[in-house]
UniProtKB/Swiss-Prot annotation:
HEAT repeats lie at residues 49-87, 92-126, 127-164, 274-311, 312-349, 391-428. This is Coatomer subunit beta-2. GO terms for biological process: intracellular protein transport; vesicle-mediated transport. The keyword Aminoacyl-tRNA synthetase does not apply. Its main location: cytoplasm. One of its GO terms (cellular component) is plasma membrane. It comes from Arabidopsis thaliana. Oligomeric complex that consists of at least the alpha, beta, beta', gamma, delta, epsilon and zeta subunits. The coatomer is a cytosolic protein complex that binds to dilysine motifs and reversibly associates with Golgi non-clathrin-coated vesicles, which further mediate biosynthetic protein transport from the ER, via the Golgi up to the trans Golgi network. Coatomer complex is required for budding from Golgi membranes, and is essential for the retrograde Golgi-to-ER transport of dilysine-tagged proteins. GO terms for molecular function: structural molecule activity. It is a peripheral membrane protein. Keywords: Cytoplasm, Cytoplasmic vesicle, ER-Golgi transport, Golgi apparatus, Membrane, Protein transport, Repeat, Transport.
Length: 948
């Protein structure tokens, strides 16, 4: 058995105390010096020292002391020292302390009595405890409750010892009498706990005979009652009906802790709708009444579990759950929205959307903290609602369009993506959305939002008035043409500065950015700078949002403007009968495109135009100069069809994910069927009937069958030594979120007893041992289990290595068996996750740690290699299947996963097929921490060749 520590004392390792110094201080008369010496002795014991020479000194000079602090430290010392020899027999000198303990138990001071009784709770040696039993019993009748409550705990601990029931034969009966007469709440709780632990039937009888008084009992006693109920119902499930009534009565208790435990107990014991509804209501009430954010997060976790198991009941409480949005904490709000979005139905969608709209309006005030981020969460939630239930889109789309000009770019981007999807899925809203978009387009200031808004204008302006308004809006936002004066460009800069004052403009710095398909391009990050005004037409920077963005060097936007104008002109040909008007508009569009090219090639622009944007604008110019039916069809129909296909694929993916979440359970054909209507209902309450029905349903559908998956358990066993070694060892590794539990089975294969056998472990990486190794004795050809816990603090590949050290009677030297290394796999800590394209790009730009792994594989098919990497890294591919379908010689995809510590792992895979059939390219891993980037890179390097 591992020894448990009951205390934690700081110890400064830099100044170890010497045993002789401690001995001198203990022999003196100075009380403070004795206290200090006792503390040093205890610290040495805690750190593995034995110091046996101090025992007699302490018996002679410390034991007689009347000082309370010294007496308390003495008990700590006695708890720590070894009281038995190697054979497990009590050391003879330990009898010396019995008389002192007896005196303490009869001491006139109640504190001395109480701490001595508490000390006896931790004594495991029957020989020491046995002479003290009469004195312990006398303390049950002491006038002070502190003594009585510790006396009850001491009796319980002694009764639980091997043969302890012989020391206190009638202990349960005695404690039951104490329970009926005791007035102190803590002593009463301890008495009930003793009955529950040592004589469960008596505890049950006492509880059932006092059912009406349970709600008036003390909080600590009510908590033990709930613990008893859980224990009894586990062994006797048929009787849980009468206990559930007690739990429901406790739901009205004044203590939040009791109410929370009641709800948890109800859920664990019953599947009846009434019980689940009561538990869910309790969690919702606590969610509103508790101010601690950690408590709120725990309650939301409980509600999430209920939502998973009992969605139909949780649907009724969706508005109660949403009230948690009143908390200013973003984590609480995010969890609340995640739960609520899974509970939306046709019946509650309008109510939910109204509540979300109110929250969006609240974010417009400057009072709330992190308004932009919260607004973004709300917009995403409303987007999800509108996609599931298109009928509500009309009530929210116009409200959200007010935020297209939001200073929070991510929030504005979410709005424009929402509008783009709604205008396609809700054709009835097309006219009103286009009208509103054209009216508010000038407010959009973000370079990432404008292209999407322009695409919507180009695709969905269908009537003559809409097309003309679209062209007019774009022209106004571009301002006067050209973008700079050619004549003024050649003038000396010094003269120019005197003629006109300088104007500030937005200039961009460029850095690599990952596109939607996973390839790299250049991203412009706007920053303010100054231009000489003579080269820029006066007033140009304030005349329109598109103009301001173009002057920063954002020529990707210029290419989008050209494409949008091209689509609008081509559509104008279809709806405008006057050729003169069409030609006039064509000329205007060509002038705009040529001006953008001119700006891109001039020294006025902070950056020259990139080749992609230049070629795109040139294509638009050629198309407007030489229009034909085939190209017209591609521009006006094919682009829209691609978007429709993308939306359909997204909806299909979401449906598949929803189906995957829904776990189906199956019953065996020969399972018994219990017909509810043929059962006796006599004396059963409605709740008991409901509970029985739910149990029958679960049994019928196979939900009671739990597959322990023993084969998987066997796969986790690692052999640590060879079969020919004198000591054979194997470990079963259980990986938890924050620690690793090792269960090492050690077998003595020799004919001798192994003494002082010790499992010595060490770690490499971000792993830490949390306990000191213990010494054991192992009989010939016997086995034992040694447990070790290792703390994990980050997602990083670690190694556990060590030895088994032992002694035998024949050989004086210690024998060492070296163990095989245990490698802790990063895959145990990361799981596939989903995030939006925008969130992926944002994280990719922010994360500083990148690990670039060159592709080196024997696999020759791009898609096969991607699937192999996904399987090897336990990540989710965010790139749509249509984007990586087909054979084109190259492939780019984004992968995403999340660790149990909340760390994000981003992977971009870019590969190309060479002429000889081999694959080349790079896999880039980015994360906020170095550990996950390096560990994942090592894993990919190991696995990419197609190894297991």
């Amino acid at each position: 058995m591992d020894k448990s520590s009951t205390m934690l004392v700081h110890y400064d390792k830099g100044t170890p105390a010497v045993a002789n110094e401690i001995k001198e201080a203990l022999e003196g008369n100075d009380v403070e010096a004795k206290v200090d010496a006792m503390k040093k002795a205890i610290m040495l014991l805690l750190n593995g020292e034995t110091i046996p020479q101090l025992f007699i000194t302490i018996i002679r000079y410390v034991l007689p002391s009347e000082d309370h602090t010294i007496q308390k430290l003495l008990l700590l010392y006695l708890e720590l020292i070894e009281k038995t020899d190697s054979k497990g027999k009590v050391l003879p000198e330990m009898i010396l302390i019995c008389q002192n303990l007896r005196n303490n138990l009869q001491h006139p001071n109640e504190y001395i009595r109480g701490v001595t009784l508490r000390f006896l709770c931790r004594m495991k040696e029957t020989e020491i405890v046995e002479p003290l039993t009469p004195s312990v019993l006398q303390n049950l009748e002491h006038r002070h409750p502190f003594v009585r409550r510790n006396a009850i705990l001491a009796i319980m601990s002694i009764y639980k010892l091997p043969h302890g029931d012989q020391l206190f034969v009638d202990a349960p009966e005695m404690i039951e009498k104490v329970l009926s007469t005791e007035q102190d709440p803590s002593a009463k709780r301890n008495a009930f706990l003793m009955l529950f632990t040592c004589a469960e039937e008596r505890a049950v009888n006492y509880l059932l005979s006092n059912v009406d008084k349970v709600s008036d009992w003390n909080e600590s006693l009510q908590m033990v009652v709930l613990e008893l109920i859980r224990s009894v119902c586990k062994t006797k499930p048929a009787e849980k009906g009468k206990y559930i009534k007690i739990i429901i009565s406790l739901l009205s208790a004044t203590s939040s802790a009791v109410i929370y435990e009641c709800a948890g107990t109800l859920v664990s014991l019953s599947s009846a709708p009434t019980a689940i509804r009561a538990a869910a209501n309790t969690y919702c009430q606590l969610l509103l009444s508790q101010s601690d954010n950690n408590v709120k997060l725990i309650l939301l976790d409980r509600l999430y579990e209920l939502k998973t198991l009992h969605r139909d009941i949780m649907v009724e409480l969706i508005i109660d759950v949403l009230r948690a949005l009143s908390s200013p904490n973003l984590d609480i709000r995010r969890k609340t929205l995640d739960i609520a979005l899974d509970l939306i139905t046709h019946h509650n969608i309008n109510e939910v959307v109204q509540m979300l709209k109110k929250e969006v309006v609240k974010t417009q005030s400057g009072e709330l903290e992190k308004n932009g981020e919260y607004r973004q969460m709300l917009i995403q939630a409303i987007h999800a609602c509108a996609v599931k239930f298109p009928e509500v889109a009309s009530t929210v789309v116009h409200l959200l369009m007010d935020f297209l000009g939001d200073s929070n770019v991510a929030s504005a981007l979410d709005v424009v993506v929402f509008v783009r999807e709604i205008i396609e899925t809700n054709p009835k809203l097309r006219v009103s959305i286009i009208t509103r978009l054209l009216d508010t387009f000038y407010q959009i200031r973000a370079g990432k939002v404008c292209p999407c808004a322009l695409w919507i204008i180009g695709e969905y302006c269908l009537s003559l008035s809409e097309v003309e308004s679209g062209i007019s809006t774009i022209t106004q936002c571009l301002g006067e043409l050209p973008f700079y004066s050619v004549s003024e460009e050649s003038e000396p800069t010094e003269t120019s500065k005197k003629i006109q004052p300088t104007s500030s403009a937005m200039v961009s710095s460029r850095k690599p950015v990952i596109l939607a398909d996973g390839t790299y391009a250049t991203q412009s990050a706007a920053s303010e700078t100054t231009f000489s005004s003579p080269t820029v037409v006066q007033g140009s920077l304030t005349s329109g949002n598109l103009r301001a963005l173009l002057l920063t060097g954002d020529f990707f936007l210029g290419a989008v403007v050209a494409c949008t104008l091209t689509k609008l002109v081509l559509r104008l040909e279809e709806v405008q009968s006057s050729k003169t008007e069409v030609n006039k508009t064509v000329s205007q569009a060509l002038l705009i495109m040529v001006s953008i090219l001119q700006l891109g090639q001039s020294p006025v622009s902070p950056h020259p135009i990139d080749n992609d944007s230049y070629e795109r604008i040139m294509l638009c110019i050629k198309l407007l100069c030489h229009r034909n039916v085939e190209m017209k069809k591609i521009w006006l129909e094919s682009c829209r069809q691609s978007f429709v296909k993308m939306i359909s694929e997204k909806q299909l993916r979401e449906m598949e994910e929803l189906k995957a979440k829904t776990q189906t359970t199956h019953a065996q054909p020969d399972d018994l069927i219990d017909f509810f209507h043929l059962k006796s209902r006599k004396g059963m309450s409605q709740l008991e009937l409901e509970d029985q029905v739910q149990d029958d349903l679960k049994r019928a559908t196979g939900e009671f069958t739990k597959d322990e998956n023993d084969a998987n358990k066997l796969n986790r066993i690692l052999q640590l030594t060879g079969f020919s070694d004198p000591v054979y060892a194997e470990a079963y590794v259980t990986v938890h979120h924050y620690d690793i539990a090792l269960e090492v089975t050690v077998i003595n294969r020799t004919k001798e007893t192994l003494q002082n056998l010790c499992l010595e472990l060490a770690t490499m990486g971000d792993l830490k041992l949390v306990e000191r190794p213990q010494n054991y004795s192992l009989a010939p050809e016997r086995s034992m289990q040694i447990k070790a816990n290792i703390k994990v603090s980050s997602t990083e590949t670690g190694v556990i290595f060590g030895n088994i050290v032992y002694e035998t009677s024949n050989v004086m030297e210690r024998n060492v068996v070296v163990l095989n290394d245990i490698h802790i796999d990063i895959m145990d800590y990361i799981s596939p996750a989903v995030c939006s394209e925008v969130a992926f790009r944002t994280m990719w730009a922010e994360f500083e740690w990148e690990n670039k792994v060159a592709v080196n594989t024997t696999i020759q098919n791009e898609r096969e290699f991607l699937d192999h990497i996904i399987k090897s890294t336990n990540m989710k591919c965010l790139t749509a299947p249509s984007a990586i379908a087909g054979e084109c010689g190259f492939l780019a995809a984004n992968l995403y996963a999340k660790s149990v510590f909340g760390e994000d792992a981003l992977v971009n895979l870019s590969i190309e097929k060479q002429t000889d059939g081999t694959l080349s390219g790079y896999i880039r891993i980015r994360s906020k921490t170095q550990g996950i980037a390096l560990s994942l890179g090592d894993k990919i390097t190991l696995k990419q060749k197609g190894g297991s």
